[in-house]
Amino acid sequence: KTVLHQQNILTGAVVSVARTVLGTIFALVTNALLAYIISRKRFLFRSQLSLFWVITMYVNGGMIPTFLLYKGLGLTNNFWVYVIPGMVSAFNMLVIRTYMNGIPDSLEESAQLDGAGYSTIFLKIYSPLCKPVYATVALFVAVGQWNSWFDAMLYNRMSSNLTTLQYELMKLLSSVTNQGTSAEEMKNAAGTVTPTSVRAAATILTMLPIIC
């Protein structure tokens, strides 16, 4: 009851659901398209691009340059900062590409003999066959989007209408945990909400949609 009656909890829940749905859809589409492109053996720079994306998995630009970049692009205090940066993931893209590499080339060649273009081959042949890996990647992205709170703190902390459920729960848990622990305060706190109970309630709220 204490958790659910906190300010901005409902707004945060709506934003979290929206970012999870939109972020998953956009990420799945872009990663699938990129994976299809670099899985084509006739694509000239497939090896170089694959190496480039692998490097980005281990080396990033750093927090401050990333913040300045997002600010310059107008993504601070903006809902799309939750969606656009996650549209391309080297890991997810390589997972889909590896799955596509296991699909026989004869299927694509037969479709080309029938006059099918690359878009038709991708939509009508590869996408139906890649449903298992699409579902896996979608689950990865959805769980990551739902559990994320750090980007809300960095980029949208000044906009209460763009807060997320996880960020609000984190602030609540921090405020309860940082309450005084002197003997007198502990005596006066009898019967009030404890950090452990808040942590348990927050855990249930964040896990329930994923479990369902």
Predicted regions and their residues:
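A hydrophobic, multi-pass inner-membrane permease signature
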Residues: 1-212
